[in-house]
Amino acid sequence: IIQTRAINSCIQGTKPVIVATHMLESMIESPIPTRAEVTDIANAIREQADCVMLSGETTVGKYPIECVETIQRIAKRIEEEDKQVLRKDLILNLSRSKMLRSAAYLAYDLEGSLVVFTRRGIFAQKLSSLRPNVPIYAFTDKPVLFKQLLIMRGVEPFFMEFDHDHE
């Protein structure tokens, strides 16, 4: 319950949320996760965390590659089951936020994707918080922002130089 509240609070505040609590601890010594660990990962994905993170499992564990493959397989399966178009509980007060929600609905209806050009990441972050069931492609010319965009749910960042000519 506490994890769910924390995740929802972060999403409401358009803050990325990472769940990292010994996700596959048993895989430090064993090539197969416990049922409880699989359930914990599945729940974090269902609760719409931006990402789940491994730590000791990959740094000191005997099966680091299997850990990454396992968490990826679980995440992919749960995300495929998610048929929700957008988070409807997200409160949008600004007209530009409502515009982003409309764009997300349109992209979903057209089976398309969303493209954002960003120097600060605000629109990409807001779109990610809506949790649209379409890809978000974010282009930036800032290396630090590129790395920040990597952890946002549904966002695939691209680094590119922007033209500074305003014509």
Task: Specify the residue positions occupied by each region the protein language model found.
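Helical hairpin unit composed of two closely spaced alpha helices linked by a short loop
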Residues: 1-22, 26
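Charged helix-capping and loop-helix junction motifs
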Residues: 1-4, 33-39
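Long, charged amphipathic helices and adjacent flexible linkers at domain junctions
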Residues: 12, 71-104
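Hydrophobic faces of well-ordered beta-strands that scaffold small-molecule active sites
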Residues: 17-20, 45, 52-54, 136
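Short, ordered loop/turn segments at secondary-structure junctions
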Residues: 21-32, 50, 56-60, 119-122, ...
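Conserved, mostly hydrophobic/aromatic
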Residues: 22, 44, 127
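Glycine-rich phosphate-binding active-site loops on the catalytic face of alpha/beta enzymes
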Residues: 40-64
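Nucleotide-binding motor/catalytic cores of P-loop/tubulin-like NTPases across gene-expression machines
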Residues: 123-125, 131-166
